[in-house]
């Protein structure tokens, strides 16, 4: 929906529920509200849907810049994933990664990791369906009386990292302000490295322990299923913290660290670095899957549990159901 049409709509009547953030938590929340017949509008400051399930095209192909994969153990989320799989949007990737550490390299088995041939963002886009998502809309303020940039709402959902939500909230909204202030987040950089050829041994993905630069490296060609000679590296929080002002300056160090780790003789043909100031929640306290207070402010995301795609989806889904029950 174009911004002008959105503005005409919300000035003609109350906006219903305004969801700020079109990542998987915000979209899952809005989906539940729409299903229950509750009027809902989604505002997203970026040009695309997806949030930290971010994919961007480099050299003609998508690469995942945020979440590296997702796992499934919730039956309801499994049903969503089954629909993605049936539509050709999601695929089982691997249940075995490797880990590099002081003792060398070893295989690590675990749950099945899922990937998306067209990028993880495509999954959020499918979930959004026909939801009224307005992109390129930067929300500036959420005030008492439930006013979003001066427009009344029946409830407001902030589906984003706590430090970003704090910038929008009027301090008079005390419960939500306290909730977002309690969140702690860690940064990361992701580097997309396109090499001349696949010179590395088969590893799919690698946890890197005790390294000054790297925390995870994924074979994006294997993950995507096209065999492209592309690696995506994720840095440690400590390394990222020193490069948040100029993330592109970290590109040589990230590339060299990957080449040293995997013994790659040739430099990358191209390299791109993306900054995540709030990459993942550092800690979670409590058992609640979302926040919803008497002021009508809801918070959702992977801060309400382990930092996983499934956590964010369930948080948004649960909040959407709670709001539908309150407003229905």
Feature annotation, model-predicted:
Residues 135-147:
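A conserved short coil-to-beta-strand element within the FAD-binding core of flavoproteins
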Residues 55-96:
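N-terminal FAD cofactor-binding segment of flavoenzymes
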Residues 252, 259-295:
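Flavin (FAD/FMN) cofactor-binding core of flavoprotein oxidoreductases
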Residues 192-244, 253, 257, 261-262:
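Active-site substrate-recognition segment that forms the wall
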Residues 15-42:
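N-terminal Rossmann-like FAD-binding beta1-loop-alpha1 element of flavoenzymes
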Residues 34-58:
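Glycine-rich FAD pyrophosphate-binding loop
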């Amino acid at each position: 929906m174009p911004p002008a049409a959105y503005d005409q709509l919300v000035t003609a009547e109350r906006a219903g529920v305004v969801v700020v953030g079109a990542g998987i938590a915000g979209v899952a929340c809005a989906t539940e509200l729409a299903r229950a017949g509750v009027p809902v509008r989604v505002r997203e400051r970026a040009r695309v849907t997806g949030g930290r399930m971010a994919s961007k095209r480099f050299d003609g192909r998508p690469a995942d810049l945020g979440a590296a994969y997702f796992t499934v153990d919730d039956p309801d989320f499994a049903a969503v994933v089954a629909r993605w799989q049936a539509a050709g949007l999601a695929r089982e990737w691997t249940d075995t990664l490797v880990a590099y550490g002081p003792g060398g390299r070893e295989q690590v088995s675990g749950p099945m990791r899922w990937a998306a041939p067209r990028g993880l963002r495509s999954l959020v886009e499918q979930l959004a369906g026909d939801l009224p998502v307005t992109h390129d809309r930067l929300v500036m303020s959420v005030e008492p009386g439930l006013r979003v940039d001066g427009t009344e709402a029946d409830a407001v959902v902030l589906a984003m990292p706590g430090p970003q939500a704090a910038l929008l909230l009027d301090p008079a909204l005390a419960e939500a302000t306290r909730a977002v202030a309690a969140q702690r987040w860690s940064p990361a950089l992701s580097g997309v490295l396109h090499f001349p050829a696949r010179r590395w041994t088969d590893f799919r993905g690698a946890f890197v322990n005790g390294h000054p630069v790297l925390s995870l490296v994924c074979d994006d060609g294997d993950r995507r299923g096209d065999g492209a000679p592309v690696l995506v590296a994720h840095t440690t929080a400590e390394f990222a913290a020193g490069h948040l002002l100029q993330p592109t300056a970290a590109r040589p160090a990230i590339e060299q660290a990957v080449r040293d780790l995997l013994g790659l003789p040739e430099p990358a043909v191209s390299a791109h670095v993306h900054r995540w100031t709030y990459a993942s929640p550092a800690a979670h306290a409590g058992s609640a899957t979302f926040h919803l207070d008497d002021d009508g402010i809801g918070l959702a995301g992977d801060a309400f549990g382990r930092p996983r795609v499934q956590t964010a989806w369930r948080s948004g889904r649960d909040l959407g159901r709670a709001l539908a029950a309150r407003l229905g």
